[in-house]
C-alpha cells in the first residue's frame, strides 16, 4: 500500500498502594480511575474528541486505543497522549479518594504501568494494527511475516527481570525455570503460544486473524499483531512500527524475503528472548537452524535493498534502518552503548546494571532477583510523568525523544488527519448540542436522529457524505441549547 493506517492498543497494569490503612481491590481501583469518565460520558467504553478510544478491558485493565494514524509521528503522539490521559485520571482519582469519595478518606497512590506482565504472572498486551489490501493472500502473508515477528523482540522488546531465571531450555513446561536470576529481551515472549489464531487471550498468538477491518471489507483488511511488548521509548516504538511496515511493504510488492516455517513458535520465542547474545537457535521444518540475529540481518538487508529500489516513503526510514543496524551490531558485540538511549530493553538494562554495580561496590549483594531491582524494573513502566523512573531519564537527557515538545499534549484533544477527524468533529458538535450519540470505528450516530447515521468506511477520509449536514444540524441544536441556557434580556 502506498499509504497505510496504523494504530496501537495499549493495556495498562493497575495497582493501588495505601499509605496507611485502607485497601482497594483491583475492581475498586478501576472504578475510581474511571469515575470521571463515567460521569462525563455515562460509560467506561468511550471514544474521545481526539479520535481515540478509552475503555476498561477484561480483568479491569485500563486500555487506550489510538485513533487511526496516517503517519508514525501521529501514532507516537497518539500513543503518548493515551498515557497522559490515564495519568490525569489517576491524579484525579487520588484526590477524590483522599477527599472521601468512597465513603471514607483513603490516602494512597494509584499506579498505572505500561508493561505486559503483573506480579502474579498474568500477561496483558500491546496490539499493533496495520491496514493492508484485501487483494493479498492473507494466509501467505502471515506465514512470511511470522519469522520476522518471532525474532523482532531482540530489537524492540521492553526487557524483563526474571528472579528465578528463564525457562529451562527445551522444556515445554511454562512454569520451569533455571533458578539463576536473569534478564530477557521481551515481556510477552513467554506468554505467546501459536503463530495465528482468532483468540487474543486463550491461545495468545502472534497475529489475531479475526476479520474485523473497521473499514470497507471489500478493499481492506487489518493485520492485528498482538505479541509485541509495550514500549516507553519513542525510538523503540518508531523502530517497531517502521520495521514492520517495511516488511509488509516488501511482502505486498512481492520483494524477495526469507520464508521460514518454524517448528515451534513458542519455543523459538522463549529461546530468543532469554539469550541476550542473539545466538540461540530455533529449528525450521526443513531441519535447519537459525538465530534471531541472522534472520533479522536478512530482513534488514532486504529492507535496505527495497528502499534503494523504491525510495523512502517517509522521513523516518533512514533513521529506522540505522537504528535497526545499530541494535543488531550492539547485540552481536555485547556493547549496548550505541543504543542504550533509544531501545527500551537496553535503556532499562543499563539502569538496573548500574544499580547492581553500585550496590556491590558498597558491599551489598545485588542481582536481578533483588527486591530493589524488581522495583526499578516495574518503576520504569510507571506512566506518571512526575514519579516515573523512565521520565526521570528523559528529563536527564538519557533517553532520545522523537516527538517535538507539546505534540503529545496536543494529541490529547486533537485527532490525526484521518477518519479520526470526522469522529472528532462529530463528538465535539454532539457534546456542544447536548445530544446523545453512539460512535464506533466506522459509525457516527445521533441517537435521536438515527436516519442521519454516518457510515465512514474509508479510514483515510477526513470527510464523508452527509457529515456537513449532520454538523450543521448539531450547530443549530447547540445555538438553541445556548439560548435556552442564557436567554436574551427583555
UniProtKB/Swiss-Prot annotation:
Enzyme class: ligase
Source domain of life: Bacteria
Residues forming coiled coils: none
Catalytic center residues: 57
Keyword Magnesium carried by entry: yes
Name of one Pfam family that matches: Pup_ligase
Enzyme Commission identifier(s): 6.3.1.19
GO MF: ATP binding; ligase activity, forming carbon-nitrogen bonds; magnesium ion binding; ubiquitin-like protein transferase activity
Pathway annotation: Protein degradation; proteasomal Pup-dependent pathway; Protein modification; protein pupylation
GO biological process terms, semicolon-separated: modification-dependent protein catabolic process; proteasomal protein catabolic process; protein pupylation
InterPro entries recorded: Pup_ligase (IPR022279), Pup_ligase/deamidase (IPR004347)
Positions that bind Mg(2+): 9, 55, 63
Binding-site positions, ATP: 53, 66, 441
UniProt KW keywords: ATP-binding, Ligase, Magnesium, Metal-binding, Nucleotide-binding, Ubl conjugation pathway
Catalytic activity: ATP + [prokaryotic ubiquitin-like protein]-L-glutamate + [protein]-L-lysine = ADP + phosphate + N(6)-([prokaryotic ubiquitin-like protein]-gamma-L-glutamyl)-[protein]-L-lysine
Record region (Disordered): 160-181
Annotated family: Belongs to the Pup ligase/Pup deamidase family. Pup-conjugating enzyme subfamily.
Function description: Catalyzes the covalent attachment of the prokaryotic ubiquitin-like protein modifier Pup to the proteasomal substrate proteins, thereby targeting them for proteasomal degradation. This tagging system is termed pupylation. The ligation reaction involves the side-chain carboxylate of the C-terminal glutamate of Pup and the side-chain amino group of a substrate lysine.
Additional notes on this entry: The reaction mechanism probably proceeds via the activation of Pup by phosphorylation of its C-terminal glutamate, which is then subject to nucleophilic attack by the substrate lysine, resulting in an isopeptide bond and the release of phosphate as a good leaving group.
Protein name: Pup--protein ligase
Classification of source organism: Bacteria, Bacillati, Actinomycetota, Actinomycetes, Micrococcales
Originating gene: pafA
Amino acid at each position: 500500500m502506498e499509504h497505510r493506517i496504523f494504530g496501537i492498543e495499549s493495556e495498562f497494569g493497575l495497582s493501588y498502594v495505601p499509605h496507611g490503612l485502607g485497601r482497594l481491590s483491583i475492581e475498586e481501583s478501576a472504578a475510581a480511575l474511571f469515575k470521571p469518565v463515567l460521569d462525563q460520558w455515562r460509560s467506561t467504553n468511550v471514544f474521545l474528541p481526539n479520535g481515540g478510544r478509552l475503555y476498561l478491558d477484561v480483568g479491569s485493565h485500563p486500555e487506550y486505543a489510538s485513533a487511526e494514524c496516517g503517519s508514525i509521528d501521529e501514532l507516537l503522539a497518539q500513543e503518548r497522549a493515551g498515557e497522559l490521559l490515564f495519568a490525569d485520571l489517576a491524579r484525579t482519582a487520588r484526590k477524590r479518594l483522599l477527599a472521601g469519595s468512597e465513603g471514607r478518606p483513603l490516602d494512597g497512590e494509584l499506579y498505572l504501568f505500561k508493561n505486559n506482565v503483573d506480579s502474579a504472572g498474568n500477561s496483558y498486551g500491546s496490539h499493533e494494527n496495520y491496514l493492508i489490501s484485501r487483494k493479498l493472500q492473507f494466509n501467505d502473508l502471515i506465514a512470511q511475516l511470522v519469522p520476522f515477528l518471532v525474532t523482532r523482540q531482540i530489537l524492540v522488546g521492553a526487557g524483563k527481570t526474571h528472579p528465578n531465571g528463564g525457562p529451562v531450555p527445551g522444556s515445554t513446561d511454562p512454569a520451569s525455570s533455571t533458578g539463576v536470576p536473569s534478564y530477557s529481551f521481551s515481556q510477552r515472549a513467554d506468554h505467546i503460544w501459536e503463530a495465528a489464531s482468532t483468540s487474543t487471550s486463550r491461545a495468545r498468538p502472534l497475529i489475531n486473524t479475526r476479520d474485523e477491518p473497521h473499514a470497507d471489507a471489500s478493499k481492506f483488511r487489518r493485520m492485528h499483531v498482538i505479541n509485541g511488548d509495550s514500549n516507553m521509548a519513542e525510538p523503540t516504538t518508531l523502530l517497531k512500527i517502521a520495521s514492520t511496515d517495511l516488511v509488509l511493504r516488501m511482502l505486498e510488492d512481492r520483494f524477495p524475503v526469507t520464508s521460514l516455517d518454524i517448528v515451534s513458535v513458542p519455543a523459538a520465542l522463549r529461546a530468543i528472548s532469554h539469550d541476550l547474545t542473539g545466538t540461540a537457535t530455533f529449528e525450521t521444518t526443513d531441519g535447519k537452524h537459525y538465530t534471531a540475529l541472522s534472520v533479522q540481518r536478512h530482513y534488514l538487508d532486504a529492507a535496505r535493498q527495497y528502499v534503494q529500489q523504491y525510495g523512502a516513503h517517509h522521513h523516518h526510514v533512514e533513521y529506522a534502518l540505522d537504528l535497526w543496524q545499530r541494535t543488531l551490531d550492539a547485540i552481536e558485540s555485547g556493547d549496548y552503548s550505541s543504543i542504550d538511549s533509544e531501545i527500551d530493553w537496553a535503556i532499562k538494562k543499563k539502569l538496573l546494571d548500574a544499580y547492581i554495580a553500585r550496590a556491590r561496590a558498597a558491599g551489598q549483594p545485588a542481582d536481578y532477583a533483588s527486591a530493589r531491582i524488581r522495583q526499578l524494573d516495574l518503576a520504569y513502566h510507571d506512566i506518571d510523568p512526575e514519579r516515573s523512573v523512565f521520565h526521570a531519564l528523559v528529563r536527564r537527557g538519557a533517553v532520545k525523544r522523537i516527538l517535538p515538545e507539546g505534540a503529545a499534549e496536543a494529541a490529547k484533544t486533537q485527532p490525526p488527519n484521518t477518519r479520526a477527524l470526522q469522529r472528532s468533529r462529530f463528538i465535539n458538535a454532539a457534546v456542544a448540542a447536548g445530544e446523545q450519540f453512539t460512535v464506533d470505528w466506522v459509525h457516527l450516530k445521533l441517537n435521536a436522529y438515527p436516519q442521519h447515521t454516518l457510515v465512514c468506511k474509508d479510514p483515510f477520509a477526513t470527510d464523508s457524505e452527509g457529515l456537513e449536514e449532520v454538523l450543521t444540524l448539531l450547530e443549530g441544536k447547540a445555538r438553541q441549547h445556548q439560548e435556552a441556557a442564557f436567554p436574551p434580556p427583555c
